[in-house]
């Protein structure tokens, strides 16, 4: 009796597993674990990047554009890397979603825009050109060093964080949510900041600062700017940084 039911039991378990995985696959909810693999993909004429996955993106400046992706063998087949009008969009295909660690290594000549639309992270040095835009629209993070721009725009919508080091003639910061901007090591001449929600920002400004805070957020600034204009509504604050 036991020997006859054992094959049936194994078959039943297998069938149950298939039934369990099938709806998950249909929804893209596949656990992307397993051995890691690396894949190189062709890209060309990239001047912006939008990271929409939970991966870690490292950007390097170089003459030859290239993209390398490291992830599990299952996950990597579902990852897309399309260039749309100069913007490299790093996403999941078909709504796929997983838990595998994803690493991107991107080499470009220069970028005008870096955007994080998911929970991923971006890092790089000397990435932006004379006019740069940095944007976070979720819970992701972005850290750029050796930044030297003429006009720099930073938008943080959500709980993400942006850290910038270097210099810019002008800086335009817009925040909505609980995000964080660390610009104490970004030397700017003219800066404007609009903070809505509970976010916090840190700036270094030497000439002119215009700041608007609504909600419970706060702006801290250093650099002893010549002109400062503030507009605060709610419990938010605009304050001078304590001497280091």
Residue ranges of predicted features:
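Short, surface-exposed interaction patches in beta-rich subdomains
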Residues: 162-244
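Alpha-helical interaction segments
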Residues: 17-18, 205
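Acidic (Asp/Glu) and glycine-rich low-complexity loops/linkers
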Residues: 2-14, 20-135, 146-150, 155, ...
């Amino acid at each position: 009796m036991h020997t006859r039911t054992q094959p049936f039991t194994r078959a039943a378990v297998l069938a149950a597993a298939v039934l369990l995985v099938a709806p998950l696959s249909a929804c893209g909810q596949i656990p992307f674990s397993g051995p890691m693999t690396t894949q190189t993909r062709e890209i060309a004429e990239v001047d912006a990047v939008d990271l929409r996955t939970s991966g870690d993106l490292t950007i390097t400046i170089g003459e030859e554009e290239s993209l390398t992706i490291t992830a599990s063998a299952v996950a990597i087949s579902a990852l897309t890397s399309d260039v749309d009008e100069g913007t490299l969009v790093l996403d999941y295909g078909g709504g796929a979603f997983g838990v595998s660690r994803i690493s991107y290594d991107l080499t470009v000549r220069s970028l005008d825009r870096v955007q994080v639309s998911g929970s991923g992270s971006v890092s790089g040095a000397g990435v932006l050109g004379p006019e740069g835009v940095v944007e976070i629209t979720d819970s992701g993070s972005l850290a750029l060093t050796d930044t030297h721009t003429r006009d720099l725009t930073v938008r943080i919508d959500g709980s993400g964080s942006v850290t910038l080091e270097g210099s810019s003639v002008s800086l335009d910061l817009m925040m909505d949510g609980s995000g964080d901007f660390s610009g104490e090591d970004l030397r700017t001449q003219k800066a404007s900041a609009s903070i809505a929600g509970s976010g916090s920002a840190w700036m270094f400004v030497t000439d002119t600062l215009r700041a608007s805070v609504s909600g419970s957020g706060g702006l801290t600034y250093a650099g002893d700017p010549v002109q400062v204009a503030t507009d605060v509504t709610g419990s938010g604050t605009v304050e001078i940084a304590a001497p280091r």
